[in-house]
Amino acid sequence: MALAQRQVSCRIERSTGASTSQPVGSCLLVQRRPGQRRGVPARATPEFIDALSALVPNLPLEQIAAPCQVMKCGDIVYRSTLDPSLYNEAGFDEKTVALLAPVLAYLFLPPGVLPGAIDYYIRAPLKRKQTKAIDKNDIVLGKRLGTGGFGTVFKGELKEEGGVKTSIIIKKAKEFGEAEVWMNERMSRVAGHHVAEFVTAFDESLNVPLPAAAGKRAAPVQPTSPLDANSIWLVWVYEGDNTLSSLMERREWPYNLEPLLFGRELRAPRGPVRELVTIKEAFRQLVQAVAACHSVGIVHRDIKPANCIVSERDKKIKLIDLGAAADLRIGINYVPNEYLLDPRYAPPQQYIMSTQTPKPPPKPVAAFLSPILWTMEKPDRFDMYSCGITLLQMVFGHLRNDNALIAFNKRLQELKWDLPAWRREEEAKLPSAKGALAESLEAGFEALDADGGAGWDLLMRLLAYKPTDRPSAAAVLAHPWLTSAPGRTASLQHSLSGSFEATVSTAAAATSTALTAAGKSLGQAAKDAGLASMEEAILKVNQGALTEAQLMEELGLQEPAPVAPREGSQTIAWWQERQNELKARLVERREAMSESDPYGAAPSAMQVGSAINNARGGKGAKPTTPVKPTGPMAAAGAAAAAAAAAARVEAKVKVPNILGVKKPASGGGSNGRANGNGNGKAAPAKAANGNGSGNGNTNGNGNGAKQQLFGGLLGRKQQPVEEVQEEPEEEVEPEQETASKKERAFNLLGVFRR
């Protein structure tokens, strides 16, 4: 208790009578009890002073000092001239930059983690909302352009609001359609000018009928077989009919490519220099398109001249047919031990990455690890080999034949992909070679030897056996053969003044025939060398039947490559989500079309009723407003209608055709209380040919004003009347009758379309 009442105070005061040895300002510790006299204060020890000095700055008390000393304001006007240590500001931190630089570099390495995330989470949803929702009811199919291993291609028209028609290309994909949609949509967002312009895609389940007013513009695209129920329809803007393959088959190659790439023919004289200019530009644009795919992590896997469209609108080469492509950023359309390729253009490895590569993990993880996998496996080198074969066909005319290309691949395999050895063999054949074969070899080697042999060096690199020995697309674009001006070497200039230029021009007319003969001979030699199975596979490719089983047979594989299950794949999940969103927007578009009626006035109720009744054989028409003919001869039509109405009162009583008037195409026991045909000469009520079996309103055809009704004309001019004998109707089987009704219905719908 005494201790609790004890008060402790510390007083720091200046000693008045202290000696000079005593420090100024000492701390005196005074202990005093109540009622006790003040004693002599004891002085504090140095340890106690140090403890207080450390405690005071940490107390939650406002500091008392000059403003600038507390705020560290320094010289505000000339602050940049001060030493950073004076106002306690950190300068350039090299360590932080050294740590962040590799991270940022990694995020931008191919295939691009950060750009891919922005595209997937931001650009893709926005682009999808901006894309117009269409289905098969908006498309009119045209002629079939061809059939490939992954589907059938048609030309057609897309009819939009306002009657605007757009020429389009439609592909009905039999397999890998979802993956091709993914590739086209992604490429259209990040590098749309390097691929054919993609419009949209839909499957058979997406079918929202057009409003009644718009139903007359287009015939729905109907599936032709039960297998079409799973088909996916892909739509592109029409870019043109010319591919590199179709152009190379003509004897005018490469001069026929000049107007498509440059907008006109080059003014230089025809010869190797001019040809090399066009070939270089075409190959440069092809590699640029391939580089655009690789920059976003897409490997095409089917690079060949047939998949290089020459756009008439943009004057450049674009890639098409992305059905075999793989998006290695997140693993879309990629299975480690599955291959998709054309054996004529594929590298010897057949796979874009090792078969031991694990299956793609979830999308975020796969995207983050994609630069490591891309750097280790170099999957883009698969496409570079295909580019090398394409370049080979550009410069060597005889290799544009399938049989010759097969023989080349076989011989290159026997030589263990030693391209210089193949060249030595071909050059040894030159003295004995004749015609187009000799011209092709001479022209090809001379073009590749131009510019110091830069073209030959590039070709050897592209056709290297090891993927790591092949250059990337960016390295090819920086190669001297594409960066230097063509024809600068003395050897090529010397060839211009030689006999080669004249030989090329004189042999152009016979090139096609000679190539065909050479292809047949090489094809026979290939068969003798054991290439019959490969030739059969190539023929099936040309017929559009390249399947996994055929590739297995051609490549000599024993076990089929497993296919990813459709139900569990990321591609199918993405496709189903896309279809649900597309259908919702399509319903909104159809509702807007029905409200605004942008296609013009709908056909009249009389016309629609007549069309349906004629298709059904005159059954089930609802009463509609009658069409009254006008003109000086309209009385005959009215009288005929009245007579037919009277005939209808008596059940199934036929009025004889006393006037001998020919029945129109739209008559014959169909709609209307009457289909009376008066010729204007007889006013009596019996002058009619009415058929009261119908249950619609009057369709009296008098010689009045001109009215167009499903092709029938009610003209002012009186037509010559011929007596026609009525033939008894044949009994039709129920199935034939149903087919006949459907045929009449589609014919009538065709009138709406016109």
UniProtKB/Swiss-Prot annotation:
Composition-biased stretches, type Gly residues, lie in 666-679, 691-703
Q: Which UniProt keywords apply?
A: ATP-binding, Chloroplast, Kinase, Membrane, Nucleotide-binding, Plastid, Serine/threonine-protein kinase, Thylakoid, Transferase, Transit peptide
Q: Name one Pfam family in it.
A: Pkinase
Which amino acids does the record list as binding ATP? L145, G146, T147, G148, G149, F150, G151, T152, V153, K172
What this protein catalyses is: L-seryl-[protein] + ATP = O-phospho-L-seryl-[protein] + ADP + H(+); L-threonyl-[protein] + ATP = O-phospho-L-threonyl-[protein] + ADP + H(+)
List, from the UniProt record, the residues annotated as the active site of this protein: D302
What is the designated name of this protein? Serine/threonine-protein kinase stt7, chloroplastic
- The organism named in the record is Chlamydomonas reinhardtii
